[in-house]
Structures are given as C-alpha cells and as structure tokens.
Amino acid sequence: MIIAVDGMGGDFAPYAVVEGIIEAVKEQDINIIITGKKELIEAELKKYEYEREKIRILDTREVITTSESPVMALRRKKDSSLVKALQLVKEGKADAAISAGSTGALMSGATLIVGRIKGIERVALAPMIPGKNGAFMIIDAGANVDCKPHYLLQFSLMGKIYFENVLKIKEPSIGLVNIGTEEEKGNELTKNTYKLLKDMDFNFVGNVEPREATNGDVNILVCDGFVGNTILKTYEGVSLNLIHMIKEEIMKSTTSKLAGVFLKPVFKKIKSRLDYSEYGGSAFLGCKGICVKAHGSSNGKAFKNAIKQAVICYDNKVIDKIKFEIEKIYNREE
C-alpha cells in the first residue's frame, strides 16, 4: 500500500508528520510519499534511522493555509503539498491521502480532485469522538451545512460500513440527532430523515438528544454538518474548560493540592480517554479514494494512528463496500 501524506499540513509540520511516518513504517508494511518542501522534510528525516526505500519525497513549493478560501486555494496553488497528495490518489499512484491542513481545502479537494463515489450525493466528515461508554462517530461533522434527507441516509450507510469494517462492530447503532426523542419532533429535515432510516435494514435507535449524544451509547450520530460541527466544537470546548476549572480549584489551597497529588493517576486516565490522537483522524467518507483528515494540532502519535486508520480502510476495502451498498439501494429503488 502507498500512502500520500501532506508533509506541510498541521500546526507542527513537518516534524510531527515525519515522526508519525517513521513510527508507522516500523509497524506497517507500507510505503509513504511525503509531499512538501524537500529541504525541510529531509532535515527531519535525517534525525531517524529507517528503511530508505519505504519513504520518498515529492517536492512541492506551495502550502495552503487555513485562512485561505478552500476552492480558490485549490485552483491557485496547484503545486501545494495538499493538492499533490490528492492528485496522487486520483492518478492511482497512492491508495490514500492524509493531511492535517485546512479542513475546508481537504474536503473540497477530496470532492473535486479525488471525486465522489457514483451515487453518493455528498462527501461527509466522520470523526471518532471519545465518549463516556466508548468512542462514537458524528457524521456529518461540518462538510455539509445544508442537507437533504437522502444525504443523511447515505451518511448513515457509510458510517455503518466504516464501523463494521474498521472498528469491527457488527450492526452498529445509529441515532438521528434531534431536539427530542419522539418521532414527530424536529424540523422537516429530521422528520423526513427519520422516515427513511426506520425503513432501512439498520440498527436505527431513533432520535438522540445532544445531552445523550456524548455518552457513547449510540455508535453513530447522524446529522447535518452545521449541527455536527456545533456538537463537536461544543464538546471540545466544554472538555477543555472542565479540565482548566479542575486545575484552578486544585491550586487554590494546600489541601486541594495534596488531594491533587493522590488523584494524579485518575486525571491521567481521564486525559488518555479524551485523547484524540488515539483515533488518528477523521475519514472523509464518500470519496473514490481514502482521504483522512488529521487534527490540526496532531502530534507524531496522531499521525501514526491516522496512517493506521487508512491502512485498515484499505485492507478492508471500505471504498468498494460503500460502492456496493449504494448500488444496492439504487437498484432496489429502480
């Protein structure tokens, strides 16, 4: 398997990217093409011992930043590390692309350069989120602000295939994010989506309120990108603020500081459970090729796990299975 990695994407590129790649090639039977500024990437690679034939560099001179218009940047910066990584997938020279760069640019590039699977209306961003009772998926988490019911139906199908093949969970539970659990609750989108999902051969558990969403009791939370992104960012903000408040309270007195010493192992375990790097990245589902968005602040561990995630998708033929299931739906409708 060949994986194209955007060597210039992310807050800590290229050193965190290279660190993750080095660890990944030790553990996986893969080859890596790093796209980016050759001199910077080579300087990082020199710090490590590795099998030279497993990693090569495709020199690029441009970088797409998060402040740029995604579509305009894709058009203007043809020699950017992100565009070149996606082009390698399109041309069949790589089996997957990974980037921690601009989410908007990667989403647009995955759609415009790699392309959508025939029958898929919209590509969806599907991050795995740590929950109280296990990790869960939000789909869509920001790629599509305005949706139609059949988009959400397709999101559910793609999430189901991902869970069954990557996470090895059979018949994952699917919930529709809504303001109430009753079938008649919500707007026109959620009401009509509910009707579609309950008629499918899914483990559909009905509507799920946001306050229950983060428990992890439901494997896949389906919603439009506006709702999904709002849940995701609220969850991140609350988690960070809660940790900050606990630290503040611990430092207020000698007694609480002493208690903090004894509770340190507990806090470490909680931090580990909330660690996004364990899950690698967020898959863009619906593309003709494997595209994974790593977190912007990804460290080496996160990049290594994002690569591992891409390998599992490839080995389990996730793209082919999405194609097959979409064809089945359309054939049934005909």
Curated annotation (Swiss-Prot):
| One Gene Ontology term of the molecular function aspect | phosphate:acyl-[acyl carrier protein] acyltransferase activity
Subcellular location per UniProt equals: Cytoplasm
Asked if the Swiss-Prot or TrEMBL record annotates the protein with the keyword Cytoplasm, the reply is yes
Annotated GO CC locations: cytoplasm
Keyword annotations for this protein? Cytoplasm, Lipid biosynthesis, Lipid metabolism, Phospholipid biosynthesis, Phospholipid metabolism, Transferase
An example of a Gene Ontology BP annotation on this entry?
A: phospholipid biosynthetic process
Top enzyme class, one word, equals: transferase
Task: Describe the reaction catalysed, as an equation.
Answer: a fatty acyl-[ACP] + phosphate = an acyl phosphate + holo-[ACP]
Which EC numbers characterise this protein's activity in its record? 2.3.1.274
Q: In which pathway does it act?
A: Lipid metabolism; phospholipid metabolism
Per its UniProt record, what PANTHER family does this chain match?
Answer: FATTY ACID/PHOSPHOLIPID SYNTHESIS PROTEIN PLSX (PTHR30100), PHOSPHATE ACYLTRANSFERASE (PTHR30100:SF1)
UniProt subunit comment: Homodimer. Probably interacts with PlsY.
Q: What does this protein do?
A: Catalyzes the reversible formation of acyl-phosphate (acyl-PO(4)) from acyl-[acyl-carrier-protein] (acyl-ACP). This enzyme utilizes acyl-ACP as fatty acyl donor, but not acyl-CoA.
Protein family (similarity comment): Belongs to the PlsX family.
Instruction: Spell out the protein name for this chain.
Output: Phosphate acyltransferase
Q: Which species is listed as the source?
A: Clostridium kluyveri (strain ATCC 8527 / DSM 555 / NBRC 12016 / NCIMB 10680 / K1)
Lineage, top ranks: Bacteria, Bacillati, Bacillota, Clostridia, Eubacteriales
